[in-house]
Structure formats: structure tokens, C-alpha cells
From Swiss-Prot:
Upper classification of the organism: Eukaryota, Viridiplantae, Streptophyta, Embryophyta, Tracheophyta
F-box domain location: 1-45
Alphabetized NCBIfam families for the sequence: F_box_assoc_1 (TIGR01640)
Annotated source species: Arabidopsis thaliana
Transmembrane intervals: none
Name by which UniProt lists this protein: Putative F-box protein At3g16590
Pfam families attached to this UniProt entry: F-box, FBA_1
Length: 374
């Protein structure tokens, strides 16, 4: 007669099963099906899952997940978003945004889909606003015990001062609430900062973060935030490095609870990875300090970002090795590839499938979190 495992050990094993396989286990027994709906198990599973990359092609609007196996081989899957919206066929043509395993997918006519690729038929369709937005972000009010997801729509134009220079941003801001299923407009005055790149907006503990630069201070860089609980933009902290011309500076989430910045010098191609010393709680009064996690100084190491391309690298640190850097970027010909870096060695891995040059990509952590569809 087979030996029954203790329930605690059974749960611990299931926490380490990849989401795609885990969703197939729902029918094994009633307890497992109930377990996969338990919020504590879902959150613990999200903390254990290995990050991967999501890549979106421009021409045919295809979306791929790219996982890195233990032996450094790539596991590539095409993710089939249900492309029939309520009124028309959806063509995802812009940047994707991530939160809690959800992908926010802006479409050609500003219709928006929020989608969990690992939970079949888990797509929420959102009607567009009249205003076109430069960027979106997905988060939630972190002061509430339950997560009430919200979407930020942020558009802007430049406003000229008396001297004729364009040194202020005139924002157009709206927030969509899943709870009310409606957009509402927010009013702000002129901003004295602009986004370094609208392609990189992070969601951490419900709050949005991105790199911004001051309009009038020679381009000083800092991290700007949007707090969904207060529906306010606020400067969060300074960058750990200077914002010199041509430098690559990429903001990512580290280990699910901290911020990380990758800096690459354009002349030496030397890389520094910085992480916040403490967990990011979202408290606007918290003091943020940085530590240097690793330095990469390898002869003939490539430049990760082309100076004249909008394509930015995305990266994460290996879950089991703080000194193992995994980067998704494009090579000098614009072809997407993966670099795995540790110590004084690096490995380049080609994707193995054909896409047009300079596709968009981002770091993604799969999850079992269901989308609130009501």
C-alpha cells in the first residue's frame, strides 16, 4: 500500500512545481483543487517560481514565454491570447506590463486586455478611454486587506515656458478600477520630470516605479512612483549611480520585494548591479539605501543596449545564485538573445526562432493568481 506523504511536505513539493504543470493537477483530487484556490498557497507559490521572459513581436503580434532551464537550455512557448475582444479582433501592438502574473496588453485602438497566460480563459477586456496614453501600469491599493487591482493610463505632452523652451510635462492621467469596472480622470498640474523610457514600468507591492529625469537639471535621474492607494505621483528615491549620457540604466524587481538597477558604461561595457538594502514596503516615508550586488568586467563583453534603438535589455538574478545574472537583449543585428553571466565568464544563447529585429521583452513571473473578472 503506498505511503501517504504528510500534508506539509505535499504542499512544499507542490510549491516548487511550475505553474503550467500545476494547473493540470487540479483534477487529481479535491484537496489539490481547493489548495490552488487558497490565497496563501498562491502567494507562496509566486515567491518560489523561477522568473522568465515574455517577448512580443511587432509584425504578427505574437507573444512568447522564454524560460531558462537548469542546464541553460531555453524553453520557448507561444502564448495564445484569446484575440477576439467584445467588439473586434485584438492586435497587441504596444508594450506589455506585468503585475502578479498578469499581463496588461494594450491593443491597436487602445482597448486593453488583462490576461494570465497560465490560467486558460482568464482574460479581462477593458474598454478604451478617448485619450491615447503613452504608458500603462497595473497595480493595486496596498492599504486594503484584499487586492483591488487598478490600471494607470498616463499620457503627456510638453508645455513651453515664456522663453519658448519645452521644459514641463502636461499630463493626462486616468485610473481604471476593477472593482467599479470604470475609468476616472485625475487632475494634475505641470510636471518637472519626464520618463527616461515608457517601456520600463514596474509594479511592486501594488505601487508603480520607473526611472525619470528632471527637465531642467541636466538630466538628473531618480525613481518616480505612482501610489494607487493615494492616486498620487511621488519621487521615491535617487538612483544609486549617475545618469551620464549613453549609460544604460534598467530598473527591475529583485527577489520579489526589492528594487534593482543595472548600469552599463557605454565606453567600457562594464556592468554594475545595485539592489536596495531593505524590502520595499511602499511606505512613502521609508529611507532607501543601495548596495552594490555585483560587477561585471569581462573583455569583449557586448553592449546590452543599442544607442539608437528603443529596445531595452531586461534581466533578473538567478533565484538560487545572487551572482548569476540572466539578461534578455538584442545583439548588434537586432536579434533577441539571452546572456548568462557569472564571474568572469558569459554565455550567449540565441532564441532559435525567427522574429523581426528589436522586439519588446520583459521579465515575467508566472502565477496562479486569478483575474477578478466581475
Amino acid at each position: 500500500m503506498p505511503t501517504k506523504l504528510p500534508l506539509e511536505l505535499e504542499d512544499e513539493i507542490l510549491l516548487r512545481v511550475p505553474p503550467l504543470s500545476l494547473t493540470r493537477f487540479r483534477t487529481v483530487c479535491k484537496r489539490w483543487n481547493t489548495l490552488f484556490n487558497d490565497q496563501r498557497f498562491i502567494n507562496n507559490h509566486l515567491a518560489c517560481v523561477r522568473p522568465q521572459f515574455i517577448l512580443r513581436t511587432e509584425k504578427d503580434s505574437k507573444i512568447y514565454s522564454i524560460g531558462i532551464n537548469i542546464d541553460d537550455s531555453l524553453e520557448v512557448r507561444e502564448l495564445n491570447l484569446e484575440t477576439q475582444g467584445p467588439n473586434k479582433k485584438l492586435k497587441v501592438y504596444r508594450n506589455l506590463f506585468y503585475c502578479d502574473g498578469f499581463l496588461l496588453c494594450p491593443a491597436l485602438l487602445d482597448e486593453v486586455a488583462v490576461w494570465n497566460p497560465w490560467l486558460r480563459k482568464q482574460t479581462k477586456w477593458i474598454e478604451p478611454k478617448r485619450s491615447r496614453f503613452n504608458l500603462y501600469g497595473l497595480g493595486y491599493d496596498n492599504r486594503r486587506p484584499e487586492k483591488c487591482y487598478k490600471i494607470l493610463g498616463f499620457g503627456y505632452g510638453y508645455s513651453s515656458e515664456i522663453n519658448g523652451s519645452y521644459n514641463r510635462i502636461n499630463p493626462r492621467v486616468s485610473v481604471f478600477e476593477f472593482e467599479t469596472n470604470a475609468w476616472k480622470d485625475l487632475k494634475f498640474g505641470l510636471f518637472d520630470w519626464h520618463l527616461r523610457s515608457p517601456r520600463t514600468v514596474l509594479s511592486l507591492n501594488g505601487t508603480l516605479y520607473w526611472i525619470a529625469v528632471r527637465c531642467e537639471s541636466g538630466g538628473d535621474g531618480f525613481i518616480q512612483s505612482f501610489d494607487f492607494s493615494r492616486e498620487m505621483f511621488e519621487p521615491f528615491c535617487l538612483l544609486p549611480c549617475k545618469n551620464d549620457f549613453g549609460d544604460t540604466q534598467i530598473l527591475e524587481v529583485f527577489r520579489g520585494d526589492r528594487l534593482s538597477v543595472l548600469e552599463q558604461c557605454p565606453t567600457t561595457n562594464k556592468i554594475k548591479i545595485w539592489v536596495t538594502k531593505n524590502k520595499i514596503s511602499g511606505d512613502r516615508k521609508e529611507l532607501v539605501s543601495w548596495r552594490l550586488l555585483m560587477t561585471v568586467s569581462i573583455p569583449n563583453f557586448p553592449r546590452l543596449q543599442d544607442l539608437y534603438s528603443n529596445s531595452q535589455p531586461s534581466y533578473f538574478m538567478d533565484n538560487n545564485d545572487d551572482k548569476r545574472l540572466i539578461v534578455c537583449t538584442c545583439d548588434e543585428s537586432g536579434k533577441p538573445c539571452i546572456y548568462i553571466v557569472k564571474g568572469d565568464r558569459f554565455k550567449k544563447i540565441q532564441m532559435g526562432f525567427e522574429v523581426e529585429p528589436w522586439p519588446f521583452h520583459l521579465v515575467y513571473v508566472p502565477s496562479l493568481v486569478p483575474i477578478p473578472l466581475a
